[in-house]
């Protein structure tokens, strides 16, 4: 069996890593190849191109690096047309993967898109391309199946999110603090996750550090910890080493899972990390900034959308504070961080609600995906 997979960024690599591991157990002799990251490679995946080349965000970044992406996309399409997989799975990265899927489906290759494009937020017209590109959408959020069914008469299959299964409902934080060498710490632990892409980290890290400095100046005592999302971010972190050191922030060259599981509270970028923090039952403050042009065009396309962070989307209310674009200022971050430290009753409520959502999301994701995959292959 030959299976093609393309994951476009770290969150896709996390999903792909557990999926490739499960596929290898089910089909030990399968060739599984395409584009992936370190977690997928560790599970036995062969990456034909570096995943980092696809990890872009915002219109300016796409314009500046778009030609390389288009070149890689054309090469991967040609490769799979010449080395036809039994099935192709595009993990997230819809602007890249839907075109790949459409091209491969046109020559008779079965395609799956894993992680629905957020057409319920913006660019809903993409449903036309989705219909042409993919045989199945695998949804990771519970409400998406009804959205596709009721609004577009298109089948999306809820497979859950592997993080919901892999992260325990009740976390032994002491275990992860010991693992990170924080055994003797008696202060509240605040995890700081400014993103995984160079562009977002360069915008958010300086703001986050200044807000934390104001928190320290106001007399708040805490221990801040921060994961290094990937080695390529080291030069950027080094640029802010003096501030990081003066705040006593420990930077760990480990995945975000361990850092979040060791934490009491979190300050982080909007994105998949907010889902992970929610599953770790962390009250949090979310911030995000795009380039001005990306933000302008994005707002023109999106309009007034209520929520950006996964916890708010899933809870259908602003259960945690999200500070987006011009609201993402040092003063606003500082104000919300103070509330995070001061309002224990609110934090207890947040933890209770996160636990409810987590229980609803638990499903054996990989087994469900393999079941869908088997059915599609048998019918072909």
From Swiss-Prot:
Family matches, as HAMAP family: LpxB (MF_00392)
Function per UniProt: Condensation of UDP-2,3-diacylglucosamine and 2,3-diacylglucosamine-1-phosphate to form lipid A disaccharide, a precursor of lipid A, a phosphorylated glycolipid that anchors the lipopolysaccharide to the outer membrane of the cell.
Annotated family: Belongs to the LpxB family.
Gene Ontology terms for molecular function: lipid-A-disaccharide synthase activity; phospholipid binding
Organism (species): Francisella tularensis subsp. novicida (strain U112)
GO biological process: lipid A biosynthetic process
Pathway terms, separated by semicolons: Bacterial outer membrane biogenesis; LPS lipid A biosynthesis
UniProt-listed Enzyme Commission number(s): 2.4.1.182
Known catalytic reactions: a lipid X + a UDP-2-N,3-O-bis[(3R)-3-hydroxyacyl]-alpha-D-glucosamine = a lipid A disaccharide + UDP + H(+)
Highest rank taxon of the organism: Bacteria
EC primary class: transferase
Keyword field: Glycosyltransferase, Lipid A biosynthesis, Lipid biosynthesis, Lipid metabolism, Transferase
Alphabetized InterPro entries for the sequence: Glyco_trans_19
Protein name in UniProt: Lipid-A-disaccharide synthase
